[in-house]
Regions:
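Cytosolic, long alpha-helical scaffolding segments
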Residues: 1-213
Length: 213
């Protein structure tokens, strides 16, 4: 028999699922524009702002559920986890906006050397893979991608560090260099937040607090 709280929890899940779609779209748009032509800053900003609003609404709804139903065990874990994930998704929107601003202000990495473009394209593909795996896991309430997430996170970290080592040897002073360093940093932070979201999902489904390493 369905409980009254189940309807409220499904509503919370629906809000977070919508945030997943918006965050994915914002990052994909901003990243594509960094390598190609486009003018999506206003659209990404609108999506980012909406994600912040939705995160606040998720928090308000979560608090309302806690006060009204005083959930325990798995119900409480779900409420806390969805609230945490909504924050991570809002941060993804902000990093997408940061990338969109770099695209607008510095022309992305379209004017960078080919090796820089390839570096960011490779790193961006891995980050988008992490985003898609994490968001699918949240939607399906599944932990089957934990090893792949861990592997991709290590790869992104290694790419980030090796890129900084290589770019430090570049003696040119150009807007393109600034742009590339900013974008790889934002990509690295997006990957971090996907790990945080997955760790929160592990807690929700198992009750254990585990770090993905």
């Amino acid at each position: 028999m369905e409980r009254i709280i189940d309807l409220e929890l499904r509503g919370l899940e629906t809000m977070v699922a919508h945030m997943c779609e918006l965050a994915h779209r914002a990052i994909s748009t901003a990243l594509h524009e960094s390598l190609h032509h486009g003018d999506s800053y206003d659209k990404v900003r609108e999506t980012s702002d909406f994600l912040m609003i939705l995160a606040d609404q998720v928090e308000d709804k979560a608090v309302e559920i806690i006060l009204k139903f005083q959930p325990v065990a798995s119900d409480l874990r779900m409420v806390k986890t969805l609230m945490r994930i909504s924050y991570d998704l809002a941060r993804l929107g902000r990093y997408a906006l940061d990338i969109a601003y770099v695209n607008k202000r510095f022309n992305g990495v379209r004017d960078c050397d080919e090796w820089i473009r390839e570096y960011i394209k490779n790193m961006g593909q891995k980050v988008m893979n992490m985003v898609e795996l994490s968001l699918a896991s949240i939607k399906d309430k599944s932990l089957k991608s934990v090893k792949e997430i861990s592997y991709l996170e290590r790869e992104v970290d290694e790419l980030y560090k090796s890129f900084l080592d290589k770019i430090a040897k570049d003696t040119s002073e150009s807007r393109a260099i600034v742009s590339s360093v900013l974008i790889v940093r934002y990509l690295e932070r997006i990957a971090d937040h996907m790990v945080y979201a997955y760790e929160a999902l592990i807690y929700m489904l198992t009750g254990r607090r585990e770090l993905i390493e």
